[in-house]
Amino acid sequence: MPLRKKGAATTKAAATRKDSAKAPASSKRKDAPQHKPELVIITGLSGSGKGSVLKALEDLGFYSVDNLPVELIPKFAELTCNNPSIPAAALVVDIREGSGLKSFPKVFAKIRKSVTARLIFLEADNDAIVRRFSETRRPHPLGTGKSITRSIQSERTQLAPIRAMADLTINTSKFTVHELRDFIGERFRGRRDQSDIMIYVASFGYRNGVPPDSDLVFDVRFLPNPNYIPRFKNLTGRNPDVAGYIRSFPQTVEFINRISDLLVYLLPHYIREGKSYLTISFGCTGGQHRSVMIADEIKRNLSSAGYTAKVNHRDIVKAR
């Protein structure tokens, strides 16, 4: 039974974008960039979750760079413009930059002429930041000779001009790491759909062990075994006659339908969690008949539902 095609969530960023300057006409230039990539710059207070946001965007397909010097941002933007294989990128700029951070407003205004740039500013209440530094036992970047509270206040003051430029400001005080990743995922979900998770469907024989990279494992040894029918013994589940025999039993059809329904329910949730690939394994005794036929059916159904799926019959080469 083909799966019903279900679209993944496509919630896009709700933050209001500021007007950006229009790039000068350059259509006559032979070296004009062929595409205008998306660049998300993450900044904000130390301990506010910048690393978690960067990782969330990386899981959504963004090319990610942490702590890039401000003076290199224009060059990085130029490289993304000239590289169609990087449709979107994310980078972190923060107080570790030191005095170079003062030039960020001018640099950010400049790159907005060549890329679709967004600035995310993360902050948190003092109590939350103090607690996080206490849990990680790491010093505050501005903590030399200062209490952590004074360091936080100093950082707020230094970053105030950049905060005023932000397209999206997030207070992460009440977020767990998991919740923050979900929050970012919901706002950039337009970049992820069925095609953003690679599904590997595998068949195997239990006599050779369960594939160690399996995320989901289903035992199909309850289905009638074609191995006991002489004309099928040396064939595989890819043979039309063998596949037809296995499919002729009501429990086979019901199993395929129920697993298909389960997967169409699970996959959007895996995508929402940022999972990039999933291995679903089906096992029978030798990995020659039943698991092969079932894996092929499930792969076909997933493909018809719009997912990118590949099938691998691990033990079929061991067929007699």
UniProtKB/Swiss-Prot annotation:
Residue positions binding GTP: D94, I95, R96, E97
Keyword ATP-binding part of the UniProt annotation: yes
One Pfam family from the record: RapZ-like_N
Keyword terms, alphabetized: ATP-binding, GTP-binding, Nucleotide-binding
Residues that bind ATP: G44, L45, S46, G47, S48, G49, K50, G51
SUPFAM superfamilies: P-loop containing nucleoside triphosphate hydrolases
Gene Ontology molecular function terms on file: ATP binding; GTP binding
Chain segments carrying region Disordered: 1-34
Family matches, as InterPro entries: P-loop_NTPase (IPR027417), RapZ-like (IPR005337), RapZ-like_N (IPR053930), RapZ_C (IPR053931)
Keyword ATP-binding among UniProt keywords: yes
NCBIfam families: PRK05416.1
HAMAP family, per the entry: RapZ_like (MF_00636)
Role noted for this protein: Displays ATPase and GTPase activities.
Similarity comment: Belongs to the RapZ-like family.
Protein name: Nucleotide-binding protein Acid_7395
